[in-house]
Amino acid sequence: MTSEQLKQMYPMYTADMLDDLFEKLVDDYKSKEYAKCRDICIKNNLNFALETPFADNFGLDEVLLFKKKGYSINGILFGLNTVEESIANVALRVQKKGHDLLLESIRWNFKHSYLNVYNHINLFDQLHFVHAQSVAENPFLFASYSEGIINFSSSQPSVPLWFSLFAQYSYKT
C-alpha cells in the first residue's frame, strides 16, 4: 500500500504517525483475517457484522462493498455529547483490557463519525440511534432511521445534543 493510499484511508494521521502506527492500524482495521472472513461471508451470502467508528474511508468502503453485493445495511450509532465523554469511554475500555487510541484519533472519530453517518445515511436500510451518555449510565435507544424517516421512541422524552446534526430528516413520533 502506498503512502498516498494510507493517507486517504487514515486522513487523521500525519506521515510520522502512520510510520509509528502502521502495524497497529493494519492489525486493528484491515488485517488479512478480517478480509478473509468478510470475503467468505460474501461468497456464501452470510450475515456479517462490522464495528467501525465510520470516521474514515474504511467503514464507508466496507458499507459500499456490502451494499454492492446486495446486503441490507443495518447500523447502530452510539453517540456521545462531548469529546470528553468519548475520551472517558476509551479510558474505560483500556482499563478492561481493550485497545487504546491516541487523543488525536478520539477527537477525529468524534467529529467525523457523525459527519460521515449524516452524509451517507441513505446507505443504511435501517439505523438505530443510541445515546451512550457516560460510562456511569446505561445507553438508550431513542430513534431509528428507515427510508428517509426518523422515528422516535415514545419512551424517551428528549433527544441528545449530538443528534442535532440529523435535524433535517422527516420525523415520526
Where are these regions (language model features)?
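Conserved GTP-binding G-domain of TRAFAC-class P-loop NTPases and closely related GTPase folds
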Residues: A88-T173
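A broad, low-specificity signal for short, low-complexity segments enriched in glycine/proline
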Residues: Q8-Y13, E33-R38, I87-L92
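Generic signal for short, ordered secondary-structure residues
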Residues: Y13, D20, N45, K69, ...
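A contiguous binding-surface segment within folded domains or other stable secondary-structure elements
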Residues: F66-Q95
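Nucleotide-state-sensitive switch-loop elements of NTP-binding domains
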Residues: M1-K32
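Glycine-rich phosphate-binding loop used to anchor ATP phosphates in small-molecule kinases
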Residues: L21-L77, S113
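Alpha-helix N-cap/loop-to-helix boundary motif
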Residues: E51, A55, T82, L102-S105, ...
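Conserved nucleotide-binding/hydrolysis micro-motifs of P-loop NTPases
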Residues: A55-D56, G79-E84, S134-A136
